[in-house]
C-alpha cells in the first residue's frame, strides 16, 4: 500500500507545466512574485527535505554524528540524489532542502542548560563545529545534490523555541549561524543555486519588550538578512512566518527590506481550514491567501508538506486523551484524492509555489532502492 501511495505522491510533485529545462541548475533570482533562471525562464521547484541524522536516516550510514561516519553519510546522500532526480524512472525532483543537523553542530562535551527542549535548545551549539562540518559534511552533500541537477536550500540547525523576542538569544544564534554560512566562499560562489531559509517554525515573535507587535517578524529577521548581504551572499533568502510558518499577514504591511527574497511556508492537512473532510479548493485558496497574503507579490517555498491516508484500526491516544489515527508514515494524514487534489489546485491557482516534502521517505522507498 505504501509503495502505491509513494507513486501517487511522486506524480503529485510534477508541475502542471515545465518552464525551465529540467535538471539544469541555472542560477535563480526573484522577479516579482516568480523565480526566474538566468535566461528569464519561470521556475517552480519540487523536491524533498532531509537531515544527515543517524536516527532520521534509520541508521543506514552509521549510528553516530562522528568523523568516522562522514564519508559514508556523503555517499548515502549521493545515492539518494541519484534516485530523486531520475526521469527515466519517474522521479522529477529539482530541489533539496538540507537541514544542518544539530547532531553535528552540538558539542557533546557541553552540558545542556535552559528550559527549551529537543532541537529548540541551543545551549550546546558550537560555532567551531558548524564551521568544521560545513566544510567537511554539509557542503559536500550540497555539492552532490547540485551534481545531480538539484537546487539546494539550507535550513539552520534545529527548530525555534516557542516564544521569540527581538534581541533574544535565539536571534543572536541565527546571526551567528548565518554569518558563518554566508561568509563561506563555496556558498557565495554558488549563490543562485543555493538559497537560505532563515529559521524553522517560529511560533510567536514579540518585540524587544515582549509585546505583540505587527513589526516584530520584520524586526527579528531583518538584522539576520543584513548580515548575510554584508558578507556578499547574493542568492535567494527565504523568510519564515509565525504559527509554525503559517502566518504572514504582518509582512504584507511591514515587509523585510531586500531585493532577492521569498517566503518559506509550511502546509499540512488540517491547516488553512482544509482537510479530508473539508477539501473545497476555493476555500483552501481563500484561506491560504488570507494567512499568506504575500503570495501575491513574492515567490513561496512550501518547505514542509506531506500527507498519507489513515491506516485503518491503528493509532494512539495523545497526551490530551484524544485518539490520533496512524497513517502510512507521514506527518500529515489525508488522501491525495481529496486534500491532495485541493492543494494541487492552490498551487496551480497562484503559479508561484514551490515545495519540498518533509522527508525523502515521503517520496522514495529508500530501503528498496538501496538494495
Give, region by region, the residue ranges found by the protein language model:
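Bacterial N-terminal signal peptides
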Residues: 8-17
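N-terminal module-boundary/linker segments of secreted carbohydrate-active enzymes
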Residues: 20-49, 58
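Extracellular glycoside hydrolase catalytic/binding regions
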Residues: 27-28, 52, 56-69, 164-195, ...
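An active-site-proximal structural segment forming one wall of the substrate-binding cleft
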Residues: 66-95, 100, 104-195, 217-227
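Short loop/turn motifs enriched for small/polar and acidic residues
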Residues: 101, 155-159, 199-201, 242, ...
Amino acid at each position: 500500500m505504501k509503495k502505491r501511495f509513494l507513486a501517487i505522491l511522486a506524480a503529485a510533485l510534477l508541475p502542471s507545466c515545465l518552464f525551465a529545462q529540467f535538471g539544469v541548475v541555472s542560477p535563480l533570482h526573484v522577479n516579482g512574485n516568480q523565480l526566474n533562471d538566468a535566461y528569464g525562464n519561470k521556475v517552480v521547484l519540487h523536491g524533498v527535505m532531509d537531515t544527515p541524522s543517524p536516527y532520521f536516516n534509520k541508521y543506514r550510514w552509521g549510528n553516530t554524528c562522528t568523523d568516522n561516519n562522514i564519508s559514508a553519510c556523503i555517499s548515502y546522500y549521493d545515492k539518494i540524489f541519484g534516485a530523486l532526480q531520475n526521469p527515466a524512472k519517474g522521479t522529477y525532483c529539482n530541489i533539496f532542502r538540507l537541514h544542518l543537523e544539530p547532531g553535528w553542530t552540538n558539542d557533546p562535551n557541553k552540558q545542556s542548560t535552559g528550559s527549551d527542549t529537543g532541537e529548540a535548545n541551543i545551549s550546546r551549539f558550537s560555532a567551531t563545529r558548524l564551521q568544521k562540518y560545513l566544510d567537511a559534511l554539509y557542503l559536500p552533500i550540497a555539492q552532490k545534490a547540485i551534481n545531480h541537477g538539484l537546487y539546494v536550500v539550507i535550513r539552520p540547525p534545529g527548530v525555534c523555541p516557542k516564544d521569540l523576542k527581538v534581541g533574544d538569544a535565539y536571534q543572536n544564534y541565527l546571526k551567528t549561524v548565518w554569518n558563518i554560512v554566508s561568509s563561506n566562499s563555496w556558498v557565495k560562489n554558488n549563490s543562485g543555486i543555493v538559497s537560505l531559509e532563515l529559521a524553522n517554525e517560529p511560533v510567536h515573535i514579540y518585540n524587544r519588550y515582549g509585546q505583540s507587535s505587527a513589526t516584530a517578524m520584520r524586526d527579528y529577521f531583518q538584522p539576520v538578512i543584513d548580515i548575510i548581504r554584508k558578507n556578499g551572499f547574493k542568492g535567494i533568502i527565504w523568510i519564515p512566518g509565525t504559527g509554525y510558518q503559517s502566518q504572514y499577514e504582518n509582512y504584507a504591511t511591514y515587509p523585510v527590506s531586500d531585493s532577492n527574497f521569498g517566503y518559506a511556508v509550511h502546509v499540512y492537512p488540517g491547516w488553512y481550514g482544509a482537510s479530508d473532510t473539508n477539501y473545497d479548493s476555493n476555500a483552501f485558496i481563500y484561506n491560504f491567501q488570507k494567512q499568506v497574503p504575500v503570495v501575491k507579490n513574492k515567490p513561496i517555498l512550501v518547505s514542509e508538506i506531506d500527507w498519507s491516508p489513515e491506516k485503518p484500526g491503528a493509532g494512539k491516544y495523545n497526551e490530551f486523551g484524544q485518539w490520533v489515527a496512524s497513517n502510512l508514515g507521514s506527518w500529515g494524514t489525508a488522501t491525495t484524492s481529496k486534500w491532495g487534489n485541493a492543494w494541487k489546485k492552490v498551487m496551480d491557482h497562484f503559479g508561484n509555489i514551490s515545495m519540498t516534502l518533509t522527508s525523502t521517505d515521503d517520496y522514495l522507498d529508500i530501503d528498496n532502492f538501496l538494495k
